[in-house]
UniProtKB/Swiss-Prot annotation:
Its EC number is 5.5.1.4. It catalyses: D-glucose 6-phosphate = 1D-myo-inositol 3-phosphate. InterPro entries: Myo-inos-1-P_Synthase (IPR002587), Myo-inos-1-P_Synthase_GAPDH (IPR013021), NAD(P)-bd_dom_sf (IPR036291). One of its GO terms (cellular component) is cytosol. PANTHER family: MYO-INOSITOL-1 PHOSPHATE SYNTHASE (PTHR11510). This is Inositol-3-phosphate synthase. It is found in: Cytoplasm, Cytosol; Nucleus. GO terms for biological process: inositol biosynthetic process; phospholipid biosynthetic process. The keyword Isomerase applies. Pfam families: Inos-1-P_synth, NAD_binding_5. Belongs to the myo-inositol 1-phosphate synthase family.
């Protein structure tokens, strides 16, 4: 059974005019390695423990502005057009049927959660019913692009939407023109130079100041309460992390003053957002968040998240390898081949930008391999190769082919071959939507453990967004989790805790 909404009644939950307050008992474990006489030496001891947390969620949903870096790209035009189509209730003719606008592919808008059972039947509700979230139809879009093409023409260039839909969207989008963007040809492929007719001039510091000015003016012009900025621009090459340049907050800010060339455009946008305490999310694989930038975000308590949208091939990989290792099967070789024909593929044809993507795609299985010391010796890892080629004809319809070779019982071999046609921007757009909505929501949640005196926000390095990214950014010293099921459970269970609901553990003891 599916229900649209619910309210929690519990002595541990209180609804006020502007807040939901909950008391949550977090059951976890503590491990110690102790010398035990009864065991004849050192032994691992696991001690269950319960920590009480208090959560406060501000239920006042703001008017949200979203500024995209690379607004005129395939992702930006697809997301903007998709939200307009949903807001206006647009339908259009395909070769098969009359299609209605929807938010399929969005975790927050199109997935469900289990809330319990009734008369022996499982009861589910929308994910978005857990806590008050911004309605995507109400989001105001803006942003920057190194191309001055309006969003209607950018949509036509992208060749993602059906022609009938494009015609209906054009009047809404032709007046939308991106602000000039930061352009540094040293960080992206040379083939992007032909698009760069809309750029911010000046020193690195002047560029950051211009972005700050743009954010303030966008917020004032559109009368929005909050702004979230997300990078959906070109993949950049990796920045060199150098002692004295960008290794600390002080050195990074000094490098900005000195106009150091190794400060990337994405890092410049992030600097501007942190100075304005605006959430910034990196949707590409480069190392935008150099150590000095992370230091600054932590000091300013300004939300940052990333890296790289997890939409197609990598999402499948994080599910399949988790299944194999969890089943006691040993993946020994993973070969992933992609070809695509959009501008992302064109930019990735340069070796230095491809390397950023290769790192992001390759690290996705690390935590799953490390979790099973029966299958893998220390330091052992599957052979893992990622190939990306640019084929203009296929456009935004990316092809992903994977071969997984695994060792099974008694030296046997199992091979799984998968072909995945990924409509790149149609998969990425709802993920962008989820990222900005969840980033905004997380800024309204505060918590404290029982031994703490004051409420505080989540750590500014937003691990809560991990489900949506290939290479999750985590606070220093925090384990990286890539397994998709664990990431979704973490996100859902944190939001459940905010309304005093137990984590979904699937035990269903009442029927055992």
């Amino acid at each position: 059974m599916f229900i649209e909404s619910f309210k929690v009644e519990s002595p541990n939950v209180k609804y006020t005019e502007n807040e939901i307050e909950s008391v949550y008992n977090y059951d976890t474990t503590e491990l110690v390695h102790e010398n035990r006489k009864d065991a004849g030496g050192y032994q691992w001891i696991v001690k269950p423990k319960t920590v009480q947390y208090h959560f406060k969620t501000d239920t006042r949903v703001p008017k949200l502005g979203v500024m995209l870096v690379g607004w005129g790209g395939n992702n930006g035009s697809t997301l903007t057009g998709g939200v307009i189509a949903n807001r206006e209730g647009i339908s259009w003719a395909t070769k098969d049927k009359i299609q209605q606008a929807n938010y399929f592919g969005s975790l927050t808008q199109a997935s469900s959660i289990r809330v319990g059972s009734f008369n022996g039947e499982e009861i589910y509700a929308p994910f978005k019913s857990l806590l008050p979230m911004v309605n995507p139809d109400d989001v105001v879009f803006g942003g920057w692009d190194i191309s001055d093409m309006n969003l209607a023409d950018a949509m036509t260039r992208a060749r993602v939407f059906d022609i009938d839909l494009q015609k209906q969207l054009r009047p809404y989008m032709e007046h939308m023109v991106p602000l000039p963007g930061i352009y540094d040809p040293d960080f992206i492929a040379a083939n992007q130079g032909s698009r760069a007719n809309n750029v911010i001039k000046g020193t690195k510091k002047e560029q950051v100041e211009r972005v700050i000015k743009d954010i303030r003016e966008f917020k004032e012009k559109n009368k929005v309460d909050k702004v979230v900025v997300l990078w959906t621009g070109n993949t950049e090459r990796y920045s060199n992390v150098v002692v004295g340049l960008n290794d600390t907050m002080e050195n990074l800010l000094a490098s900005l003053e000195k106009n150091e060339s190794e400060i990337s455009p994405s890092t410049s946008y992030a600097l501007a957002c942190i100075e304005e305490n605006i959430p910034f999310i990196n949707g590409s694989p480069q190392n935008t968040f150099v150590p000095g930038l992370i230091d600054l975000a932590i000091k300013k308590n300004s939300l940052i998240g990333g890296d790289d949208f997890k939409s197609g091939q990598t999402k499948m990989k994080s599910v399949l390898v988790d299944f194999l290792v969890g089943a006691g099967i040993k993946p020994t070789s993973i070969v992933s081949y992609n070809h695509l024909g959009n501008n992302d593929g064109m930019n990735l044809s340069a070796p230095q930008t491809f390397r950023s993507k290769e790192i992001s795609k390759s690290n996705v299985v690390d935590d799953m391999v490390a979790s099973n010391g029966i299958l893998y010796e220390p330091g052992e890892h599957p052979d893992h190769v990622v190939v990306i080629k640019y084929v203009p004809y296929v456009g935004d319809s990316k092809r992903a082919m994977d071969e997984y070779t695994s060792e099974i019982f008694m030296g046997g071999t199992n091979t799984i071959v998968m072909h995945n046609t990924c409509e790149d921007s149609l998969l990425a757009a709802p993920i962008i939507l989820d990222l900005v909505l969840l980033a905004e929501l997380s800024t309204r949640i505060q918590l404290k453990a029982e031994e703490e005196d004051k409420f505080h926000s989540f750590h500014p390095v937003a691990t809560i967004l991990s489900y949506l990214t290939k290479a999750p950014l985590v606070p220093p010293g925090t384990p990286v989790v890539n397994a998709l099921s664990k990431q979704r459970a973490m996100l859902e269970n944190i939001l459940r805790a905010c309304v005093g609901l137990a984590p979904e553990n699937n035990m269903i003891l009442e029927y055992k």
